[in-house]
Amino acid sequence: MSLLGKYSWSAPAREKYRSEYAILPLLCVIFANRKKVCKMKKMLFVPAGGLANRMRALAASYTLNRKVGVEMESVWFRDWALNAPFHALFEPIHQEGLILRDASWCDYLTLDRPRRKNLFVPRLYQRMMFRDALYEARITPLRMQHFDFEAWARQGDVYLASYTDFYPYDYALLRRLFVPLPDVQREIDAYEDRFSSHTIGVHIRRTDHMASILQSPTELFVEAIDREVEQNADTRIFLATDSEAIKAEMRSRYGNRLITASEEADRNSIAGIKGGIVDMYTLARTEKIYGSFQSSFSELASQLGGV
């Protein structure tokens, strides 16, 4: 008879162990690393949200840390908002004072943003390991109150999670931090090869952003595009959208003038997220961008291209 059979536990006993002792491995991790981490004058930064939100938040945080002279480590988590590791989208970052890595299984227990889905377990680790922590829900209110992020970060040993551009940054920094992988870059170049002497970019967001739907109706985009075509007969349109219906409508109206992805938008797969990067960086290469209201994707495309 095996030990497992001889000493098998009843269901109530197993449940008692889980509830009372399951935290022990986490505590071991905490105390094994506390001395090492607490001696480091740095910031642990977690970018949150979708692709564009993460990009601008990372640029803001890195600029802040360079300003105050604190090292920065960033951990990239996969979740419902962006289900892809950093290394599957972009080249490794080579910037002084910044280390970015994809999250490990242990990071999900210790460094992820505390929330209902993880039973707020990471908060225990973060309270013990960091001098202070600011989570994404507090960033915008603090900025409106003119919170001194520099003084807060300068002391080091802090944790920050954000999806906003809470600190000003040079738009050129985006191009240094986020370099698309070669296969993604080839797609961007292929779209640009189809540009005319006057190519405009259009980003129409429809599926999950109510403000964009209400404030940026399709009629406004059509009016703007029609004006461009009337003023320049060589006008072409690069369209980035998450709506297949919009693609069909624009193809019907503008025919060969329209350049757009044939694949359906999907941010839940790595291939789909790569497609989003292609759209963003191709928009950045157009002469002018007509974007959607309150869309960080439109804003980032404009910042990347200086449009």
Model-derived features: positions:
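Short hydrophobic alpha-helical segments enriched in small aliphatic residues
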Residues: 22, 29-32
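A short, glycine/small-residue-rich beta-strand->loop->alpha-helix junction that serves as a flexible
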Residues: 47-56, 209-215
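Histidine-anchored nucleotide/phosphate-binding helix
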Residues: 55-66, 221-222
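Donor-binding and catalytic core of enzymes assembling or modifying cell-surface/extracellular glycoconjugates
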Residues: 235-307
